[in-house]
A protein has these predicted regions:
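Short S/T/G/P-rich N-terminal loop/turn motif that feeds into the first structured element of a domain
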Residues: 1-75, 84-91, 112-121
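Conserved, mostly hydrophobic/aromatic
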Residues: 79
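A common structural junction motif
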Residues: 96-105
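A short, structured active-site edge motif that brings together acidic residues
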Residues: 105-113
Length: 121
């Protein structure tokens, strides 16, 4: 049995201690057959030509891309975005929705906005 110790340090990551109001938005997506049939190089080109330029237009958003498909049947990928600007986030979502990302290459399963350790903020 594990002996639980009281928390003596903050669970908030050091890079967020200065701004506890950073939104962490998890976007669960399922790859469509269109995406799965593309070669890896063409997938990279799509991100380089569509997704990355959108992020460059909104530097308030940082994005990471995870691949849980070996562990989950619900989502092929999880996009984790961080921002303090929900207007920038809404713009980014609208732009993705108007591109081949949304519904053509990926089915957006869920969007989960969160705060890190919100109960302590």
């Amino acid at each position: 049995m594990t002996n639980l110790q009281p928390m003596t340090t903050s669970p908030v990551l050091p890079e967020h201690e200065d701004d506890p109001h950073t939104f962490h938005i998890l976007v669960l997506v399922k790859a469509t057959r269109h995406w799965l049939d593309m070669k890896t190089e063409k997938r990279r080109v799509f991100f380089d030509e569509v997704v990355i330029p959108l992020l460059r237009q909104r530097p308030e958003i940082r994005m990471r891309w995870f691949e849980p498909e070996a562990f989950s049947t619900r989502a092929s990928y999880i996009m984790l975005c961080e921002t303090t600007d929900l207007s920038a986030w809404a713009w980014f979502c609208d732009e993705l929705r108007d591109s081949l990302f949304w519904d053509h290459y990926f089915e957006v399963i869920d969007i989960l906005p969160t705060f890190e350790a919100n109960y302590l903020a």
